[in-house]
Amino acid sequence: FLDDKFDEYFIKGLFFRKMKQYERAEANYREALKIRHNSLTAKNGLAISLQRQDKYNREALNLARFTYNQQPTNPYFIVTYFKSLIRTNPDQTIILNQLIKDLRSSWDINKESFGDMLQAEYVFFIEHDFNRAISIYKDTLRKNPLYPVFISLHEICSIYQKRCGIGSGIASEIAKRYHFDVDNDDSF
């Protein structure tokens, strides 16, 4: 019975995350984790749900770090950990670079594109070079137009827009070029 309830909460968490109802996703992942405390996929789903609510906090970081430490070759866990770490502890450049390297050597068929995505975030957050980050995103999308890469670019453009008042048109232009629908979030 408990496994059935875990599955129910986990699937609802995934469903609500895909529907961009992140608070509901968070609540369902939390319920799933009450039943199966060490479920790596539920912990990762909860970390992503927190991130999507712009809650790049200690909880999201600890969840992401835990899942990564349990399965350091899992590309999904690498991405989640990287995204939390770079936003909360950007001084951890050795770890951040290792995560990019780990992702590029993972089993994922899109490891190069996702590695480039993390590299673009690194260039933006650590090197503070928006234009170079955008150039990396554009090159990556030209080779392999993956929606998660676009979502990452969209997030960076939104942050840059808030900081500097410019940059929002770039994501819109790329969305049109590759027929991406920002409302249809199909990323990690």
Language model regions located:
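Residue-level recognition of tetratricopeptide repeat
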Residues: 5, 14, 39, 48, 74, 83, 112-113, 121-122, ...
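Position-specific recognition of the canonical hydrophobic site in helix A of tetratricopeptide repeat
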Residues: 14-17, 51-52, 86, 124-125
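Residue-level detector of the short coil/turn that links helix A to helix B
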Residues: 20, 54-55, 89, 127-128, ...
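Single-residue signature of alpha-solenoid repeat helices
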Residues: 25, 60, 96-99, 133
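TPR alpha-solenoid repeat register
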Residues: 8, 42, 77, 115-116, ...
